[in-house]
From Swiss-Prot:
TM spans (from-to): 12-32, 173-193
UniProt xrefs under InterPro entries: HATPase_C_sf, His_kinase_dom, PAS, PAS-like_dom_sf, sCache_3, Sensor-like_sf, Sig_transdc_His_kin-like_C, Sig_transdc_His_kin_SpoOB
Subcellular location: Cell membrane
Species classification: Bacteria, Bacillati, Bacillota, Bacilli, Bacillales
Task of the protein: Member of the two-component regulatory system DctS/DctR. Probably activates DctR by phosphorylation. Essential for expression of dctP.
Any single GO CC term annotated in Swiss-Prot or TrEMBL for this entry: plasma membrane
Pfam families hit by this protein: HATPase_c (PF02518), sCache_3_2 (PF17203), SPOB_a (PF14689)
GO MF annotation: an example: ATP binding
Protein name from the UniProt record: Probable C4-dicarboxylate sensor kinase
Signal sequence, renumbered to the chain: none
Keywords associated with the record: ATP-binding, Cell membrane, Kinase, Membrane, Nucleotide-binding, Phosphoprotein, Transferase, Transmembrane, Transmembrane helix, Two-component regulatory system
Name of the gene: dctS
This enzyme's EC code(s): 2.7.13.3
Phosphohistidine: modified positions: 336
Native source organism of the sequence: Bacillus subtilis (strain 168)
Amino acid sequence: MNKKKLSIRWKITILSYILVIFSFLIGGIVLIGNIQHTEERELKKRLMNTARTVSEMTEVKEALARKKQTEAVRHAVEEIRMINEADYIVVMDMNHIRYTHPVSTSIGKKSEGADEEAAFAEHIYFSEAKGEIGTAVRAFYPVKDQDLNQIGVVLVGKTLPGIADILLHLKRDIAFIVVLTLGFGLAGSFLLARHIKKQMFQLEPHEIVRMYEERTATFHSMNEGVIAIDNRLVITIFNEKAKQIFEVQGDLIGKVIWEVLKDSRLPEIVERNKAVYNEEIRVSGKVIMSSRIPIVMKKKVIGAVAIFQDRTEAAKMAEELTGVRNFVEALRVQNHEHMNKLHTIAGLIQLGKSEKALQLAFQASTEQENVTEFLHRSIQNDAAAGLLLSKIRRGRELGIAVHIDENSSLQQFPEHVDQHDIVVLLGNLIENAFGSFETVQSEDKRIDISIEQTDDILAILIEDNGCGIEPTHMPRLYDKGFTVNKTGGTGYGLYLVKQIIDKGSGTIEVDSHAGQGTSFSIVFPMKGEEAQHGS
């Protein structure tokens, strides 16, 4: 049978109450000790004053001078003793003979106290002696005649009050303080325990431990990387999948995020208090899909959490599919174009114009070979070449001449930019150029594409003579969801283009005039910013 565990509320209450009682006892001991010292100091002062008073009494001086013990002296001294609450007053002459004493049988007898000798040499002092009923304090004072010659000694004694005496004397005050202290201590302990339990969401420590272990196990078993920081940019969560994605090891909890990851983009979430969803970033050659959300409590940002998904394999497949799709599109357009030309050639043959039909066939074959050979020679990436071929064919379908500068060249990709990025960038810019002709009525519709590459830069220029972009649209050109296409468009094309340019540390310039056309000029450094600064 399991014993019922004592709740944290009662544990805190009992512990706090014990601490209050212990503190009260310690305080009481210190206080009683101070009272004892004060009582001793006051007692010594009172005893010495009493001894001095007795030594100056005329009756005492006359009795000592005449060496005559009288009842009058004993009564006078006894009266002084009672007034000053002394236990005893002893008057002795220079022969140590007692003239007064609390025990009448001792009067007239010689005193043999070990602490008396100094008093007969005109010394004024105190002595203490422990007895059966406690410690007695004795004050010694010399008695002198008119000529200042010592004629005797006055000894006044009293037992120091013990702890029991002090407690008995202060019993009412102590009772009041005990009730007040313990009452407030009990109430305070209970309120403190209740407050702590409330701060713990009414959970017991073992329940919190279980929840923490479950949460930790859940985070580490997730297939997504999870990183959380507080408003001081200190890491509070860094699960195992995140360590795999970012290739880090060890216990990272408690470290500043900058020390572990240079580009987690979490600090900007804390600063701006704005969530970012499904953003693709590149880290260590990996394609990462990231969502970053601020953690808000009571309208105050207390941290941020990021969820990362490794999309590297998916991105590679997408790149392959993109290349295949571009070639398929190019073949579809080419097939459509060839079918039209074949019909034309068949018609010419039926009309008996065989030479003209043969000339048209050679012309079509030559054009196709020239375009294919040029793209194969100048554009080393198949996906990019397939994209450009499909756009050339599609332009012919739309009645738009797509020209690629004969000096164009693409041999390799800049650092931080890959095949997928170049295909997305070219595809979106060329599609935007196609869209600019939707409202244009012109015989000369033209798109010019130039791709120039050196050891230092990759420059891409795409120009069209379409409708252009309104000046009012320019500030929002790269905003997610914003589109200038009146007949459709998702608003993601130029947003993705800008993301790719930022990732590759590139620049983009737009020159557009309404009714005249638009040009996009993009420049990527072949080496990243860090490499350039290092060199």
